[in-house]
A protein has these predicted regions:
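...with weaker cross-activation on analogous glycine-rich loops/strands in unrelated enzymes
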Residues: 32-87, 91, 96-97
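Intrinsically disordered, low-complexity N-terminal regions enriched in serine/proline/glycine
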Residues: 5, 20, 46, 77, ...
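Catalytic cysteine-centered active-site loop
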Residues: 2-54
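Non-catalytic ligand/cofactor/substrate-binding and regulatory segments of enzyme domains
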Residues: 1-2, 87-112
Length: 112
């Protein structure tokens, strides 16, 4: 998955998370065109917030006007990241890098 290119319509951060959960955990997450409020509402119904990250937990990252989602594993966060007009791709960031780049970071564990 690392290196898979970002596409806002076909493979954005929510698509990546849905693929991760489907491939690794056999959990189907609805895919949305872009990460939006409806996904957050769905997430809060099916995940429980946890204080510390655990392998395969969902990571919700927020900055001023943006929400972003990834998955915690291998002591960091895998996420499909795009800056400006770059192509973007799936990357793995250490947790400290995530915390420095986003104002609010929360962790969510599958609850069903």
């Amino acid at each position: 998955m690392i290196g898979s290119h970002y596409n806002s319509e076909n493979f954005n951060c929510a698509h990546f998370v849905a693929q991760w959960y489907s491939d690794k955990l056999c959990i189907e997450i609805p895919v949305v065109d872009e990460f939006e409020l409806s996904f957050v509402r769905w997430m809060r119904k099916h995940f429980v917030k946890i204080d510390k990250p655990e392998n395969d937990c969902l990571v919700n990252m927020q900055s001023d006007n943006n929400s972003h989602v990834g998955v915690y594993s291998d002591y960091g966060v895998y996420h499909n990241y795009k800056v400006g007009k770059s192509k973007g791709s799936v990357v793995h960031w250490e947790l400290g890098v995530v915390m420095r780049n986003y104002k609010k970071v929360t962790f969510w564990k599958w609850s069903q």
